Design a protein with these regions (language model features):
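N-terminal entrance/gating region of PLP-dependent enzymes' catalytic architecture
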Residues: 1-54, 60
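General beta-strand structural signal in soluble alpha/beta enzymes
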Residues: 9-12, 61, 67-72, 98-99, ...
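Short, flexible micro-motifs
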Residues: 15, 67, 160
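Alpha-helical structural motif
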Residues: 19-20, 55, 106, 132
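Conserved redox-cofactor binding core of oxidoreductases
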Residues: 20, 74-79
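Short, surface-exposed alpha-helical recognition segments that flank or form part
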Residues: 43-50, 70, 74, 153
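Phosphate-binding glycine-rich loop
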Residues: 55-69, 81-94
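Conserved PLP-enzyme active-site core in the AAT-like
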Residues: 77-175
């Protein structure tokens, strides 16, 4: 057993090593973190609203991004909210490009959210298990794209090389 090497697993479909810091179990049991529901009474909500504001401010500072969101129920709804935010940040475009290598369950939630906001979800093909960057660049150049969604590692467990993708997006005014 001592001769075995511990390697990083990228099996795909969410089956990979997960690390949960020991503080998490104590934190998630606290009432203010137990739900993303915000009470309607202002005097009760102030603490909740304050820590959400602090979290969002810290996330924008850490990531260098202009916008951040909090209070998401799970990864799928958080991703769908990111699609809504990309659309809202764009003044003209209402299309979001999504790689075929994104988890189908996440894609299903995104499509549901997008449908009711009249956001067009357009898929970007994959080649050999990775996002087709040529097709992505071609679709971005149309100029009507609010954002691009990729997953890392992707649904197939592959760590894609996304170098240059952010530059492509920014050159075409997409998030």
């Amino acid at each position: 057993g001592n001769k075995n090497k511990q390697l990083t697993c990228f099996t795909g479909a969410g089956v990979y090593d997960h690390y949960t810091p020991s503080a998490i179990s104590s934190l998630v049991g606290r009432s203010e973190f137990l739900t993303s529901y915000t009470p309607y009474q202002a005097e009760i909500s102030q603490g909740t609203l304050h820590y959400i504001f602090e979290f969002q401010s810290m996330m924008t500072a850490l990531t260098g991004m202009d916008i951040s969101n909090a209070s998401m129920y799970d990864g799928s709804t958080a991703t769908a909210e990111a699609v809504l935010m990309a659309n809202a940040a764009s003044k003209k475009a209402s299309k979001v490009l999504v790689s075929e290598t994104v988890d189908p369950k996440i894609l299903s939630v995104i499509k549901t959210y997008a449908h009711f906001q009249h956001i067009v979800i357009e898929m970007v093909s994959q080649k050999d298990g990775v996002t087709d960057k040529q097709q992505l660049e071609q679709k971005l150049s149309a100029g009507d794209v609010a954002g691009v969604l990729v997953q890392h590692p992707n649904y197939l467990g592959i760590v894609e090389d996304y170098e240059g993708v952010a530059d492509m997006c920014h050159a075409n005014k997409a998030l």
